[in-house]
Structure formats: structure tokens, C-alpha cells
Amino acid sequence: MSINPITRNKIKDYLNGFIDQQLAVYSQRNLREFHDVDSYLAAISSDGDLKPFHASIIPSAIMRLNRFERSLSTGLGSTFEECARVIALDHHAVAIRSYDIHTSLDQAVWASIDLLISNIDRNNQRQIPSITEMLEKLQSIALTGIAENHVVRADLYVQRHDGSELFFEIKSPKPNKGQCLEVMQRLLRIYAIKQNSTLPTHAFYAMAYNPWGANRASYTYSIVKKYTDFTNAVVIGQEFWSLIGESSTYTELLEIYREVGLSKSSEITKKLL
């Protein structure tokens, strides 16, 4: 078992608290009931959440559930980061969320990274350069001798017991183009900062799950494949959780989510229906 009982309970407590918080926030929001067309159209919403066609055709109970599900899904991404941190602490020396690297590098390095990202942005080819190829370009540039201070943040930082480092940007498995470019820029900056480190450094775009299936080959989202080094810089589902813990971590974590979901289902249903 890769997730020990103590960590398992920590995760369950955290997820229970997360759902309680979501329910508390939702309970403070009033879903406008549809009684008749005239009264609904006469209503004013400061939040801009009036949906006359939806409210006309969809039962109010379903609308409430849908609204809660969207709210829950928005916040669910943060639970992946915290669960990864807690699990990583059982398997590695250090695990920190929102990890900041304060650094000073030559102006030319920062500018070259931005240029590489700009080239990816304008990419009309199927394959962008690999992370390794881009780092080789950075190492060959002429320096200005003028240093610039920057802070680069990683969603999750892990230091293994051998001193090697892992940096993760944990994002949606269906990002837009801008999000892909932002992650690639951050990964390149991390590698540039760590280029003289004597210990191995790896930086990844991490996806907590694969919407298309269990294996990597099933992932077909074209934007990620076009605007990231998908082969070398992206880890998905099982790959990510195995780096955090062990090969069984992904399925064990899903089982914990399922246990919490089942235990909270009656409470959620009671409050929403």
C-alpha cells in the first residue's frame, strides 16, 4: 500500500473539509426559482446569473445540482495539489506547494526564453523543439552581463532523498493555448535556473488524470500536443502519481475520493434536492 493509513486519514479529512466548505459557500447563494415568465424576466441579478431558457426547461433541483457540480469542479484542482503534497511527504524528503525560486539570471537568458515561447506561439508545424533542444539553445546565447531578478513559482516542489528535484505545474488536462505557453515558459525558466546544479532536476506539466482513458496513448488533446513538449515535459494520470508515490498511488487515491464521495452523498443530496 503506497498511501499509509495515517496519510489516508489526512486526505479523507481534507476532502471532507473541502466538500463542507463548498456546501457552505453554495448554501449562501440563492438560486432563483422559475415560477412564471413575467416574474423571472422582471428579476435583476447582481451576479449576472439569470438563465431564463435554462430555468424554463430544466427542473430547479437539477439546476441546483448542476450549479454545485460546477462550483465543486472549479475547486477540485486544488485538492490534487494538496493530496500530491501529502503523499509525496511519505515517499520523499521534501514536498512544498506554491514553491518560489528567487533567482538572478542574465537578461539574455530571460529574453531568450521569451523568444522561444514566442516561436512556439507562432508554431505552424506539428512538432515543437524538445525541452532539451531549447535548453541547448539557451546555453549557446551571448550573455549581456546584466542580471535580472525574478521569482519563479512551481505548483509543487519535491526533493527526493538523493537530493534530486522535481517541479510540477499541475494544470487542467484540457488547457487553452495560453495556459500551455505559460507552463512551457515556467518549465524553461526552472531548467535555466537549475542548469548548473550538480543534482538532477526535472520539471513537468502534470495532469492529475486523463479524460480520454487510462493510458498515455489515448490522450488526444491537440492543443497540448501542439504547444508543449508532450513527449518529455507532460506527465498524465498514472505517470504523475507514480512520480509522487508508487505505481498503485493513483488507484489508491481514487479509492479515497470514492469513499469520501459515498460518505457525503446523502448530505449533499439532502442539501441540494
UniProtKB/Swiss-Prot annotation:
E.C. numbers: 3.1.21.4
Organism domain of life: Bacteria
InterPro entries according to UniProt: Restrct_endonuc_II_TdeIII
GO molecular function, one term: type II site-specific deoxyribonuclease activity
Pfam families: RE_TdeIII (PF09520)
This protein's UniProt keywords: Endonuclease, Hydrolase, Nuclease, Restriction system
Catalytic activity: Endonucleolytic cleavage of DNA to give specific double-stranded fragments with terminal 5'-phosphates
Example GO BP: DNA restriction-modification system
Family affiliation: Belongs to the TdeIII type II restriction endonuclease family.
Annotated protein name in UniProt: Type II restriction enzyme HgiCII
Organism for this UniProt entry: Herpetosiphon aurantiacus (Herpetosiphon giganteus)
Gene: hgiCIIR
